[in-house]
Regions:
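Catalytic Zn2+-binding segment of zinc metalloproteases
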Residues: 28-37, 45-61, 88-90
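Active-site-proximal beta-strand/loop segments in catalytic clefts of secreted hydrolases
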Residues: 4-7, 26-27, 43-45, 98-99
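Active-site His/Glu-centered metal-binding helix of metallohydrolases
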Residues: 42-51, 76, 80
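Catalytic zinc-binding patch centered on the HExxH motif and its immediate surroundings
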Residues: 1-20
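C-terminal capping/extension segments of zinc metalloprotease domains
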Residues: 1-4, 30, 75, 79-177
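Substrate-binding clefts and substrate-entry loops adjacent to catalytic sites
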Residues: 52-72, 101-105
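Envelope-exposed proteins and targeting segments
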Residues: 18-20, 36-39
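Short, aliphatic-rich beta-strand segments
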Residues: 20-26
């Protein structure tokens, strides 16, 4: 699939699910410090576009799924974005750092249908840890303040992941925030 162009757009949501156009919010651009972080944003948006394009009427109907249950599709797009980044030789940890910079944490929002950013970052970390462990060994982000913040605030969750791996458990981990 070819992407026609990348635009910036002032709009309340990212729309990359129809017409093969990737939109990037202008408010995000000042937070991008590296090519890896730009690749993270684009990979996530492209993953949404690719996922929705395979639907009825070329994806026009599947956009309703995103509005009804965005949580499921964001988590799938996060994993696909990691795969895209690794295949394109970008550091997938940038997805964690950019989410740490721009992600809003709706901790007490009972009506939110989005996964908490802290949980999303941990699920991305778990996916990288299990599928691409060599990325974590000696990475360029080890001194990055946003990655360090993630490591500091996710210590208990990373211990849960370590316990799951050591016990060979197949159970899903309920990460705290």
């Amino acid at each position: 699939m070819a992407i026609n162009r990348v635009y910036t757009r002032d709009f309340w949501t990212d729309v990359s699910s129809v017409n093969r156009i990737v939109w990037v919010k202008p408010v995000v651009i000042p937070y991008i410090d590296t090519d890896d972080e730009l690749a993270a944003i684009l990979s996530h948006s492209i993953a949404h576009g690719v996922d929705s394009y395979e639907g009825i009427l070329r994806g026009y109907i599947s956009i309703l799924n995103y509005w009804v249950a965005p949580n499921k599709y964001d988590l799938k797009a996060d994993k696909t974005a990691v795969d895209y980044m690794v295949n394109a030789d970008y550091n997938p940890l940038a997805l964690i750092t950019i989410l740490n910079k721009i992600g809003k944490q709706y901790r007490y929002d009972v009506f939110s249908n989005h996964t908490l950013v802290s949980r999303r970052m941990m699920l991305i970390y778990e996916y990288i840890y299990t599928k691409y462990p060599n990325v974590l060994v000696d990475n360029d982000y080890k001194d990055n303040i946003y990655y360090q913040n993630f490591l500091l605030t996710s210590r208990k969750n990373r211990m849960k992941l370590l316990e799951k791996i050591q016990t060979n458990s197949k159970n899903k981990i309920r990460y705290s925030y």
